[in-house]
């Protein structure tokens, strides 16, 4: 097939079945021509599909998205960038699209890549548009990872659907004890708060939290921790409570 002739036909002809002709072009490896057919017909999403699936040029797809500036095009670009592990670029594209629909995959890949801090902006967009426990839960965790504790306090004071206890445990396991303290306090989980305060060397606070928890195993933990730290007066208080 003479590609120059095909291009000329596309420019001159009209009234043909766009999808059928574009498919024939793709089947024959004429990807640029298929892109041209879809673009001329204003089938922008199909044109974008050709760029990312057949021509395989994310840079050209980015240029195409910038040129058209349409939500559905930004969204398609975001998915292609995510598939190519361009995580930050993908999140930026989804934000431009105001499209939170692929949040599960975005969260999974961003967290695996250690991009929690950059994920915050995407999650802020997603929270405005949808009410999902996973989004709020990840948002709280990302704020903790970014050490944005004042923002976390503000988030916890507002209505949210986060699994706060899960985030608290995750932060505790990561050694983010100040974040854990805020999280456990916000849900009045005094048993876990007591343990966290021991790690923060706040022994009087830990004893008070243990008292509120009223749990024998928590008191035993307080007793051992206070002895280990040389806090004998507090260890005696904990021991008497066991």
Regions found by a protein language model. Name each.
Residues 1-242:
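Extended alpha-helical assembly domains of large eukaryotic scaffold proteins
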């Amino acid at each position: 097939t003479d590609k120059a002739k095909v291009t000329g036909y596309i420019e001159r002809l009209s009234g043909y079945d766009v999808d059928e002709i574009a498919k024939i072009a793709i089947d024959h490896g004429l990807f640029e021509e298929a892109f041209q057919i879809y673009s001329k017909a204003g089938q922008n999403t199909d044109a974008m599909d050709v760029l990312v699936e057949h021509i395989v040029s994310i840079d050209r797809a980015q240029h195409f998205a910038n040129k058209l500036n349409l939500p559905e095009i930004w969204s398609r670009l975001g998915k292609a960038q995510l598939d190519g592990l361009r995580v930050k670029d993908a999140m930026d594209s989804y934000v431009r699209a105001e499209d939170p629909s692929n949040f599960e995959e975005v969260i999974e890949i961003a967290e695996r890549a250690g991009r929690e801090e950059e994920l915050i902006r995407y999650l802020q967009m997603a929270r405005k548009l949808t009410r999902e426990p996973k989004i709020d839960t990840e948002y709280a965790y990302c704020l903790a990872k970014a050490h944005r504790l004042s923002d976390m306090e503000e988030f916890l004071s507002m209505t949210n659907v986060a699994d706060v206890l899960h985030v608290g445990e995750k932060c505790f396991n990561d050694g983010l004890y100040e974040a854990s303290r805020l999280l456990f306090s916000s849900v009045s989980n005094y048993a876990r708060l007591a343990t966290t305060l021991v790690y923060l060397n706040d022994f009087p606070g830990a004893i008070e939290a243990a008292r509120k928890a009223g749990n024998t195993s928590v008191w035993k933990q307080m007793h051992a921790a206070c002895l280990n730290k040389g806090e004998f007066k507090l260890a005696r208080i904990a021991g008497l409570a066991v």
